[in-house]
Amino acid sequence: MCRKLFCLALMAMTLGFLSCSDDSGETPPAVKNVWGITYSHKNLGAYPDLFSKYWVYAYETSKNPDVGLRISGEYPDTRFFSFSVYNDMTGEVIDGLDDVHITPDKGSVNPYLATTESKGNRFTVYLLKQGTDLSLFPGAKEGNVCYFTDDVECLTVCLRHYLGVDEFGGVSLPVVEGVNLRTGKTVTTPDAVVSRATVMRQGNYEHVASDDNNEVPFILAPRGAYFPNNSTDYLFCRTKLTTDQVLSFSFIPVPVPSRVEDYLGARARYWSICIGSLQNTFSYSSFYDKMLSYPENEKITVIVVSANNPRLAEVKKAAADIPYSYVMEWDETIVDAHGKAIGDIIAIMYRNILPDNTWEHSIKNMEPVVSYGDPYSMVTNPETQIAHIALGDYGPLGVKQTTGEFLNKRK
């Protein structure tokens, strides 16, 4: 989200892929594992959710101009899964498919639309160049196709899982095969290249004036050009939190469904709060909707405090008396992969997956503010850009206090 240059990553050496030769499609090509390693908050920046997993495959379309992709596999057992397609050179999202919109193969059912006991339900999706003749791919369903354009030189596909039953959602990762866009025949899957999505980035950690403000508004993050999740919108704030401060905010969370049958038409599929370091854009603390018991349409209170606050135990005890509250600790002394302490300048993300833009309180209807520099200085229309103004009780507003002020208020 932060518009900073990418820095060299450790991950590049971990993406070991098989080499392959060109194939006309006349001889059935060998299936290759192109997904590489599993990514998570431990090895990926841009403030990922702690409850998500990612797999990335990138190939050079400029060197494979007549090759698209067929991706087939079993529906995973997750809270949510999706495919996102990016222009790897720019990081901009091109297309994507969410679980509820992936039509199952013949004889299978989509378990994200109805509860089912059946196993082995399968899907097939295609990545094709715009203008491709779909009649060449009899198995392709219009709704299961993502498209890219001629000007894309390198294409990245990202598979996302949220809250899977295990690392891979209880199934094998989908098989990726190359397809000839002119003939429809299966060809060798293009060699994988290192995607910019997996390259560690530095954060926007310079101190700005608003970091010291005691009032900490939330604003809508722009989609940006760094591999955003096309299914998700985010409210965020940034601030400096010292070891003698407590940050708290209250709001009514977006309603989320408890049954698969209610996924379609939900106000949002999932929400979470995560805290990351402005220094490296990694996330270190997070919780999601089902981790807190609260009545629908009631306010919750999130309390953020340094793990090194000398009165931490007192803060936790006071928080226990606040209805529907959750305490999040931040340890500014943690040392990251660059050998630097993650510091006390933090970003807090309120994530909504598949927010419903027809709902009057949806963050989808807010106007984004740029997320680099001092974002609060760039607000031009508070009525649509500041969450607690635009959304009322559904929009969080952070307030920082000294530890003493926080505790005295609750005596």
Description of each model-found segment:
Residues 13-33:
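Bacterial Sec-dependent N-terminal signal peptides
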Residues 27-411:
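A compositional/structural signature for long, glycine/proline-rich flexible linkers
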Residues 1-18:
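Sec-dependent bacterial lipoprotein signal peptides
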